[in-house]
């Protein structure tokens, strides 16, 4: 019956973006983790002595998050990017300076180009805490005594990768913490927020091999500075020594957690997306730095190619710097409805803006054939000729100031298991430890 219902759905290719992207789940991870009851039925690893495999897998996830964000500490996942944003606001409220607490500083500045679903959840969670969200342009932000924190999106909801380094300095000078919602795959190419002063970096790892399902779930990530570790939501996996002096994994700093502290807790989060975080960690292990950089570069190259071709058709692209998302102002003789009609006839969903602009986000599954179809939609709408291509050369359009220069995924675990057989044996070795 469920299959019958599912078959009624029309399967279109979606390029809407906004935090959700098609991705390729490596078959070795799908078979040996996602479809394996050893991994999908396991409960919270309270008994560390019978949970070493799961704990190591989650440590891989934390390490990957720390490396990609350039932050010193990460937890082993939260429920979703939007709830991670709400947790970031609650955490920054808890770590206000004494002067801010005395002055009852209760305002968070939020850049207007944050994902709408993230803003909605932050608003829902802020109201009962007495926190006011002030939404505006980050370039117009002026610090004031009542503002204790700022939240930014990187790249923003239009796809523009802004240079927030000056903004962050300005905020810190006014004793404001800065939280950044980041696209984790873009951080393979873009300067990570940890390098330009972010206090908290959060987001989703959905595009690290987690299918979209019915719009969720996927594991959120949350990273912060070491000095804020006791206020961090979620679970943290750490190292310890057993009674024989042997190194082992266990859940660290548990006394700060809500299920132990209860009324004194700064977070009500006592749970995680352990299975999907495990999968994202294995995705990083399987691909390593080189593989993830190749995936990110291919996505960016296709985006650069499409921008160039659509400009030839008379479209104006508004993002100065981007990773995978383009937003176009249309020529006078072209309407968004024309584009929508052509796109739907080709079973494609694009993003349509309220002001009439049209955009799309490229992902890991986009190939040359898909790029040709996207090009054809805009060319036909504009009445222009277009040439199909057989290959798209690697090209970067990222400014030097925004380009990542530091290595990531440098731990040996990320360079040892790059074939299906090696990966399968590693996963099996870990599940035997549980």
Regions flagged by a language model, labelled:
Residues 140, 247-249, 385-406:
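Long, charged amphipathic helices and adjacent flexible linkers at domain junctions
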Residues 64-85, 104, 108:
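A conserved hydrophobic secondary-structure block that centers on an alpha-helix together
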Residues 83-248, 310, 327-328, 341, ...:
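Conserved PLP-enzyme active-site core in the AAT-like
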Residues 342, 351-377:
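Noncatalytic alpha-helical scaffolds and linker/capping helices
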Residues 313-342, 362-366:
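Conserved PLP-binding catalytic core of the aspartate aminotransferase-like
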Residues 1-60, 66, 260-261, 400-434:
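N-terminal entrance/gating region of PLP-dependent enzymes' catalytic architecture
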